[in-house]
């Protein structure tokens, strides 16, 4: 490790230990299927287990369903068959590490506005060079950055498109020093998809209806 990298590590540790971070307990949530991402409000769906209420092959006409979706169909987040580039649960830790190496978006103001001083020598206090300051800021940002991790979710045959890309926040690592804070959902958006709905009044009648399906759009480090 060269002298510059060593200084970055020392200063970063000192800065993080000096930050005032609130700690809090984490609450776990029980989901019913199909479950939107993490702890966002669940879609109020009651699914009867009897396969008689499943759509038949004639009800899965892609041309017709596409027309019902209109401009709501988003190929980046929806698919009729399971995409080959899907990620498993075991891949999330690796993806989280990869995305944190190059944080996206704008650098948080509380990190961008930090000033660093060389106070290692008693009685002396000098502002660090711009290059070293930038390295420290990037290091802090990578440690506290909470990327959204996207995976494909199978909603079952009663939803179209059947596969939706949902977001999650990786909470198996702490995003603070001292440890205690984790990445949690901070913002959500809604996708419009179709749900196969059956009613028994006056004989069984089934049709596709549009529903709003929430997915995580932003994660933040919090208690």
UniProtKB/Swiss-Prot annotation:
SUPFAM superfamilies reported in the protein's UniProt record: Cystine-knot cytokines (SSF57501)
Q: Please state, per the UniProt record, what induces or represses the expression of this protein.
A: By sonic ectopic hedgehog.
Please give the biological process terms from Gene Ontology that the record holds: cartilage development; dorsal/ventral pattern formation; negative regulation of BMP signaling pathway; negative regulation of lens fiber cell differentiation; negative regulation of smooth muscle cell differentiation; osteoblast differentiation
| Gene Ontology cellular-component annotations | extracellular space
The protein's recorded glycosylation sites are 61
Is GTP-binding found in the keyword set? no
Indicate the segments annotated as coiled coil, or none if absent: none
Q: Which cysteines are joined by disulfide bonds?
A: 146-183, 169-219, 175-221, 198-206
Keywords per UniProt: Chondrogenesis, Developmental protein, Differentiation, Disulfide bond, Glycoprotein, Secreted, Signal
For this protein, the record's Pfam families field holds: Noggin
The record's note on quaternary structure and interaction partners says: Homodimer.
Protein name per the record: Noggin
